[in-house]
């Protein structure tokens, strides 16, 4: 079983406008509301692929109830911890080819609610093979919270796929317990290391991933967007090349990549096939209008067209 963790979920609300007018009323009938947050995107894609998945995290108020109900309608198993404060909204206004976002900070999780979640997490990982941890931390959660989840998973011999950035990622990398896989994109890696990889990025990334902070992480997958990825498994590097596609909505493609990687791991896929599952799911997500969804037949089609090449040491 794969457990997905989303500690700061949201309702993603999208408004489509012909023109955004300031300081007046804007009306639209084209509105979508979906359960959001990186971990829930991962959840939906694993479910679309046919994987055995259960979603956990924290949900509160009417917004939390909406998310829980939407997952129930999609037949996605869930085991969230209830919190007192309201789960946030994330608003995207699509206008004139642009996207203007309004993102709420979200709820504050109390110490008692943190304890309740950790008890729930302890029970879930007893049944799990893989845990995915995605996105930001809600207010009230300590900056080393993900390190604690990784430690708990290690104790149960559960593989952790971590997709976060900034201080949350840095805290885990500096800690004694390492995730099984991380997937920063090139920009996030540059921010983490304070380096510029614009010149000769392939060689620069290879050198960077041998730094001591990455020791003990079995898989590091660096997303290069339309240029594919560079990956490191133990001491072996891989270059992943993907075909050009017509993207409809690239939002959530990184989350879909994590979902594909988790699904491949659950299938005990060998290295090259594992990377193909990740890239194929990310590509298929970009071809859907709805974030965090894939067409399985499209994923399988992409699997045939992705090249994975070992980079000579």
Swiss-Prot record:
Record has Glycoprotein as a keyword: no
Transmembrane segments: none
Family matches, as SUPFAM superfamilies: Ribokinase-like (SSF53613)
Keywords per UniProt: ATP-binding, Kinase, Lactose metabolism, Nucleotide-binding, Transferase
Any single Pfam family the record assigns to this protein: PfkB
E.C. code: 2.7.1.144
Pathway note: Carbohydrate metabolism; D-tagatose 6-phosphate degradation; D-glyceraldehyde 3-phosphate and glycerone phosphate from D-tagatose 6-phosphate: step 1/2
CDD domains the record matches: FruK_PfkB_like (cd01164)
Matching InterPro entries: Carboh/pur_kinase_PfkB_CS, LacC, PfkB_dom, Ribokinase-like, Tagatose/fructose_Pkinase
Cellular component, GO annotation: cytosol
Class of enzymatic activity (EC top level): transferase
Reactions listed under catalytic activity: D-tagatofuranose 6-phosphate + ATP = D-tagatofuranose 1,6-bisphosphate + ADP + H(+)
GO molecular function: ATP binding; phosphofructokinase activity; tagatose-6-phosphate kinase activity
PANTHER family in the record: 1-PHOSPHOFRUCTOKINASE, 1-PHOSPHOFRUCTOKINASE-RELATED
Similarity comment: family membership: Belongs to the carbohydrate kinase PfkB family. LacC subfamily.
Protein name: Tagatose-6-phosphate kinase
Organism the protein comes from: Enterococcus faecalis (strain ATCC 700802 / V583)
Encoding gene (name): lacC
């Amino acid at each position: 079983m794969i457990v997905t963790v989303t500690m700061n979920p949201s309702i993603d609300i999208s408004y489509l406008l012909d023109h955004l007018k300031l300081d007046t009323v804007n009306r639209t009938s084209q509105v979508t509301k979906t359960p959001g947050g990186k971990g829930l995107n991962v959840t939906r894609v694993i479910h679309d692929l046919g994987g055995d998945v259960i979603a956990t995290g924290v949900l509160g108020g009417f917004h939390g109830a909406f998310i829980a109900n939407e997952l129930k309608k999609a037949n996605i198993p869930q085991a969230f911890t209830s919190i007192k404060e309201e789960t946030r909204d994330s608003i995207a206004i699509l206008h004139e080819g642009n996207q203007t976002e309004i993102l709420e900070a979200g709820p504050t999780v109390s110490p008692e609610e943190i304890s309740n979640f950790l008890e729930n997490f302890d029970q879930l990982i007893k049944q799990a093979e893989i845990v995915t941890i995605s996105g930001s931390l809600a207010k009230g959660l300590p900056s080393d919270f993900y390190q604690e989840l990784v430690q708990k998973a290690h104790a149960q011999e559960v593989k952790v796929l971590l997709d976060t950035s900034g201080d949350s990622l840095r805290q885990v990398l500096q800690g004694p317990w390492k995730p099984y896989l991380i997937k920063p994109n090139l920009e996030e890696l540059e921010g983490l290391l304070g380096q510029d990889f614009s010149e000769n990025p392939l060689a620069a990334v290879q050198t960077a991933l041998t730094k001591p902070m990455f020791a003990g992480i079995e898989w590091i997958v660096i997303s290069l967007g339309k240029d594919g990825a560079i990956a490191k498994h133990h001491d072996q590097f891989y270059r992943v090349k993907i075909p050009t596609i017509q993207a409809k909505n690239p939002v959530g493609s990184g989350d879909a990549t994590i979902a594909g990687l988790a699904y491949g791991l659950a299938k005990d896929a060998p290295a090259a096939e594992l990377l193909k599952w990740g890239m194929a799911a990310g590509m298929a997500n970009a071809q859907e209008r709805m974030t965090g969804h894939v067409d399985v037949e499209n994923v399988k089609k992409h699997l045939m067209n992705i090249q994975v090449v070992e980079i000579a040491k």
